[in-house]
């Protein structure tokens, strides 16, 4: 079990997709760079219905690229207490 969880605050998210493009896990999907969201479930996050959604928490490496890319602070890593 990871010591952190990627949390999205949908009320803040504008669905710009900056986080999706910045994620190194998502980068392996060519459609990410074409301006489309990845269709595979083998990604960490994607935009669905105008809001970023965590698709696969287990793939998140905790690098924080998505957090840095978000202009509205809609994403954060929440560290779990032991």
Swiss-Prot record:
Keyword Repeat assigned: yes
Q: Which residues bind [4Fe-4S] cluster 2?
A: 60, 63, 66, 70
Cofactor requirement: [4Fe-4S] cluster
Q: Highest taxon of the source?
A: Archaea
Q: Which residues form the 4Fe-4S ferredoxin-type domain?
A: 4-33, 51-80
Which InterPro entries does the record match to this protein?
Answer: 4Fe4S_Fe-S-bd, 4Fe4S_Fe_S_CS, PSI_iron-sulfur_center
Which free-text remark accompanies the cofactor? Binds 2 [4Fe-4S] clusters.
**Disulphide bridges, residue numbers:** none
Q: Which GO terms describe its molecular function?
A: 4 iron, 4 sulfur cluster binding; metal ion binding; oxidoreductase activity
- Give the transmembrane region(s): none
UniProt keyword Isomerase present: no
Q: Which UniProt keywords apply?
A: 4Fe-4S, Iron, Iron-sulfur, Metal-binding, Repeat
Binding residues annotated for [4Fe-4S] cluster 1, in chain numbering:
13, 16, 19, 23
Q: What is this protein called?
A: Polyferredoxin protein FwdG
What is the scientific name of the source organism?
A: Methanocaldococcus jannaschii (strain ATCC 43067 / DSM 2661 / JAL-1 / JCM 10045 / NBRC 100440) (Methanococcus jannaschii)
Organism lineage reads as: Archaea, Methanobacteriati, Methanobacteriota, Methanomada group, Methanococci
Could you tell me the gene encoding this protein? Answer: fwdG
């Amino acid at each position: 079990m990871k010591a952190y969880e990627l949390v999205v605050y949908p009320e803040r998210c504008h669905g710009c997709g900056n986080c999706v493009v910045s994620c190194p896990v998502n980068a392996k999907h060519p459609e990410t760079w074409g301006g489309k969201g990845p269709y595979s479930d083998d990604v960490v996050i994607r935009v669905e219905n105008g809001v970023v959604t965590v698709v696969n928490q287990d793939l998140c490496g905790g690098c924080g690229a998505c957090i840095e890319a978000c202009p509205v602070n809609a994403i954060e890593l929440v560290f779990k207490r032991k």
